[in-house]
Each structure stands twice: as structure tokens, then as C-alpha cells.
Amino acid sequence: MIRGSRYELSGKELPRFLPWVREMLECDVHPGNVHQPQYPTSIPESHVQPEFFAALEKFLRSNQIDTSGETRLRHGHGHTQEEMYSIKYTRLGRIPDVVIYPEAESQVTSLIEVAKAHNVTLIPYGGGTNVTDALRCDEREQRTIVSVDMRRMNRILWIDRENMMAAIEAGAVGRHIMAELRKHGVTMGHEPDSVEFSTLGGWIATNASGMKKNRYGNIEDLVLDVTVATADGKLERTSASPRESVGLDLRRLMFGSEGTLGIITSAVVKIFPLPEVQRYGSVLFPTFEAGFKFMYDLAREATPPASVRLVDNLQFQFGLALKPKSSGGLADLKSKAEKFFVTRIKGFEPFKMVACTLVFEGTRGEVTRQESDLYRIAARHGGMKAGAENGRRGYQLTYSIAYIRDFLMNYYIIAESFETSVPWTSALALCENVKRRLTDEYARRRLPGKPFVTARVTQVYRTGVCIYFYFGFYYKGIPNPQEVYLELENIARDEILNSGGSLSHHHGVGKLRRAFLPRIMSDTAIQWKRGLKKSLDPRNVFGAGNQGLDG
């Protein structure tokens, strides 16, 4: 049971989940077999020069400076499985020495000047949701490390309804942006899975993608201008125009910069009227291949809805296992009748069928037209409408996945997600190749039970798709399971690249994938990036070290 009340699964009994996990992984998962967390683990001491503190106190209040152990620990990691395992069971070798909470752009620029004067390194912090080791501190770093938590810079500075733009501070969290804009009848439309906790600055720094990009675009489509505090001063412009041809666009340097070039302080973004209609939907397909062909035709022949996702059979079963305890009576009867119709009348095989979940947004006319086109194309590929409620539930489950992952770690199960983008012609083979490679490698190492390997197509483009993988296994008896997992994930990443996929669609590079950069870009490209870093930040004030850009 997930505690609290924020999520749809909160407070609900899930009687089928652990038995399903036990059967699927072929492992000894039960309430008496628990790996008890040791949080908080050993916390490294803080080392801050008195002179640096004295300089900070000239422009910051005492409640903007925090050296407490747990605060520093929380700012020293993201959400990779390795980081979660470390804070639960071992330790992080290096964490920030101090956390600073600026409340104005002037304080950010003053902080950078003080950091330069006292040879201190700065790591920007948004929501802490990254899964690339982007926040992990280098254990070799001898300088004082400052985590710059931007979340107090969270204001919407202005809204222009006539030109449909808004200026927002970089520390604003996604759910707060949505709530504030809604008061004015508008939305930004950017909803990554981490929207509850991630920030506008983090979205830009990681070049993020949202689940509704089909309607609103990815972050690079939404941001019109960005203001950045750098080691040399402020990067800003006088206006935000619809489009410009003014030479090299320095704003674009910040997309995917991952904290290595400066601190994003605000951005001007596009906004949209709140949709007149929002509807969910879902479609069942007899096989993953049939569902994939449907998505291909949908991208070619129609306007895809705000979001469309296709999950494979194992992920479909995972969702069924998370259904709450039934109230009995008519609910049970309805469920049995639906299962009978799908498997007996329609002939769908339980261990081959897959599901597609949908979100439609727009005017009533737009949504009606999209639904008509989509369900017509789905029927051509053997698809069967499965109702709005199943679609809504599928998207709500998105927000609980991280908690389920962390819950399962207590039962000796380690798991993580990784993603890629790939042309249509290589996508199906890539899915199969990655699943086969991981399964074979797992067996070769004689690890316990069976691995959990599943995939979903989570974004569609005219030229290809984004594919999201989940991988996990039972780790009891495996020494250093987080390292074993990382080795296997790197093997999966190797197979992704061999199969024509990208290094990342929206998670980014961080430190987790920097070793793969020579596989995807030329030596000249890498040297240009390093040269840019040395030119803009010669003293490596922004010392996150992501992408190998460490001065």
C-alpha cells in the first residue's frame, strides 16, 4: 500500500502485486524477506572556508545558507538506482558542503563572483529528479562544493495574453507553473513524468520532453528566450521574438547544458489557452507489432493526440497487477465479462496482447476529429477500444512508478528506466535486440531468477519514436548489486547504439552516459564542446562535471 493521498494508488490495497512480482522474477519476495534501509547513511563532513561564509553573509540571510547533514545529502544525488541504493544501504562518497537558496537574480550573480574569488565550485539544483548522476559530486574535488537550490526563485514574472507568452523564474516547479497559469486560463503544456517536482530551469538544462509534446512541443519548442548567470556575466537579450535570424543563437547553448555553463535564472515561454476538452482513451491490440504499425500509420495519416503510448505485454501485465483490491459484486462481474470478451470472443492471447493509452486535448471539434481518425486507424490493425478509464488510470500510474521502484528495493529488487529515440525502421528490432541482450547477459552471469525487461513506445515523431525501457532483477546474494545493474545497463546502451538508437531522448548525459559520447560524435565535436567550456568557464566554477565538461 502506498501511503498518503496524493496519488490514485494511495491508500489502496494491492493484493496481486507482490505475488505477481514473485512469480515473474522467480524469486523469494514476501513481507518477511526485507532489506531494511539504513537511511540516513554516513554523511561526509562539511568543509567551508570562514572567509567564504563571511562573503556570503554580505548578501544572503542566514536562512538562505544551510550546512546541515541531511539537507546536503538530499542535494547530493538524483534518482538513479545507484544513488537510491547508496543512500539506503551504503553511502555517497562526496556531497555538497553547503546548500544556498538564492531568491533573486542579483543574488545568483553575487554568488558567482564570490565563488570565483574563493575558488568554490557551484552545482545548480532544481527538483533533483535527474536519472543521469548529474548531481553526483566528484570525490576527487578538493574545492568547497555549493549546491545552488533555485526553488525560491519560483515566480511568474509576467503573462502576456495577447502574444501568448509568459516569463517565469527558473526555480518554478512544474505543478506550480501549471496551477498558477491555470488561474489565468492558460497553460504551458509541458508535462514530463517528473512534473510534480522538476523545474523550468531543469527542463532547459536537460533538454526535456513532456508527455503532451504532440500538442505543445518539447522544451526547445516552448522556450523563446532564456536568461543565464555565467562566469563572465549575464547572458540575456532585449526581446523575445517569434523567430529570428541573428547569427549564432547563444540561447541554444543552454539546452542540454546540464549545469556546466551557468545558472539559468528565468525564461520566456509560449503559453496556450486551456483546452476546451480533455479526454482519455485506450486501445487493446493483439500484439506489440500490430500496435506499433498503428502508431506508424497514426503519425503518417492523422494528427496524433496530445499523448499516445504503447506498452508491451509485460508492462501491460504489470499494470494489471497494480489494480487495487476489488470491492466485489458488480465490479468483479464486469471485470470477468470484459476479460471473457477480449480473450474468448475477440481471441486476444493474454500473454501477447498490448495496450495503447491516449490523452486528447483541444477544442471539442479537434478532439472529436482526432478520436475518429485514431480509432479508425486502430481498427485497421486489429485494435479494440478499451475505454477512457483504462487510459486515465495508465497515465495516473506514471506518477507512482518511482515510489514503486523504491518500495521494491526494500524487497531486494533493483530497477531503473532508460530511454532512446530511434527511426521507425529500426524501432522494433531495437526493442527485441535490447530485451534479448539483457536476458542473455543475465543468464550468462548466472544471476538469480529471471530479469524484468519491458518496453513502451512513449513518443511519436514523423521520423521515429522514443522508446522507454524498464529493467530490474532480484539482488539478494549479489555483491554490490548497484554496480552489477550499471554494468548491465551499459550493455543495454551498447545494444541500443548498435541498433541505431540515440544515446538519450530526454534524460540527458550527465555522468552516467558520458563514456558513450565518442560513439555518437566526432573527435572534433567533442573538442569543440570542451573548448567552449574552457572559454566560457576557464576556472570551472560550474563544476558539475557532466558530459565530461570539467574544465
PLM regions and their residue ranges:
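Activity-critical C-terminal alpha-helical subdomain
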Residues: 234, 509-551
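FAD-binding subdomain of flavoenzyme oxidoreductases
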Residues: 154-311, 323
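C-terminal substrate-recognition/cap domain of FAD-linked oxidoreductases
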Residues: 11-31, 62-86, 292-491, 499
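Glycine-rich tight-turn/loop motif centered on a GG-T
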Residues: 97-99, 141-145, 165, 414-419, ...
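Glycine-rich N-terminal segment of FAD-binding domains in flavoprotein oxidoreductases
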Residues: 47-53, 57, 66-151, 170
